[in-house]
Amino acid sequence: MLLLAAGTALRAQTLGGEYRLSRVFPVEGRQGIAADSNYYYVSGSTVLYKYDKQGRLVARNGQPFEGLPLAANHIGDIDVWNGEIYAGIETFEDGKGENIQVAVYDADDLTWKRSIDWEPASGQVEVCGLAVDRDRNMVWMADWVDGRYLYGYDLATGKYVRKVHLRPVPQWQQGIYMAGGQMLISADDGDADLDEPDNLYIADLRDGKSYATVLPFRMMSDFRRAGEIEGLTVDPATDELLVLSNRGSRIVLGVVRGFYQGYDRCWEWSGVSTRGTTANCTKCMSMKR
């Protein structure tokens, strides 16, 4: 899997209203994707990757849990901001999460720097999606097990701030990304066995209320044999919306349990550009041989 990382200050991002698929390419890692002006960052369940915009591997951390304050075995979604990668990390077994934390890594060499503690009293029991709110200096987490709420933490203090009730609740949330106070949510809510597409949703958090209305944003019907879609992000240099997809993989309780006929690998991603009405979509996926 690939995405871009850098430390260049860029303009505030806004979301487009329409996207079309523009390109597809395979990457390593099947969980999260992040981008800055120069690099792509991708998370596998136990590995972090960094690629340049030409798809060349620049850095790899195969031991991302080394030094963490809590034992962990699973990386979920990621985001990148101000030269740091934020990763939702936990111990994940049989569809349940423990030892939740936001681990922060150096975007240059992918080494761990620090972690933000999880607040159990918030009610969060798992972490799937993660997004940095660049306007309010917060980091948000989503919960795959109980997806009713998004959970926000202050980046300056690391303290839990609040949760937002999603109404209605997208089923099997995977990734989140915030732009201009609006939260994009990817959901593995299509039954891949029946060739049902997964979907993207949007929720407006700008009013600061304890709840937010969730609306359909995009049906990912142009993803073939998606298996499940995962993390998503917007490339700040190109305005492309990038969506990770485990094409060809059969997923049961969040774990790959083999492949559909004609496939022998997974791990792909995709993206979508957001400039004007001609916005396009980029998608990275594992291809059948």
Regions found by a protein language model. Give the residues of each.
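Beta-strand-rich domains and repeat architectures in extracellular enzymes and scaffolds
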Residues: 21-46, 74
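Surface loop/turn motifs at the tips and blade-to-blade linkers of beta-strand repeat domains
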Residues: 21-27, 62-70, 116-125, 164-169, ...
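Repeated scaffold domains used in trafficking and secretory/extracellular systems
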Residues: 27-34, 69-77, 122-132, 169-177, ...
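Short coil/turn segments that connect the beta-strands within blades of beta-propeller domains
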Residues: 37-38, 82-83, 135-137, 180-182, ...
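Short loop/turn segments immediately following the C-termini of beta-strands
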Residues: 45, 90-92, 142-146, 188-191, ...
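Structural motif
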Residues: 48-51, 94-103, 147-152, 192-202, ...
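Blade-loop segments of beta-propeller domains
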Residues: 57-92
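Loop/turn-rich, solvent-exposed surfaces of beta-rich toroidal or solenoidal domains
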Residues: 168-205
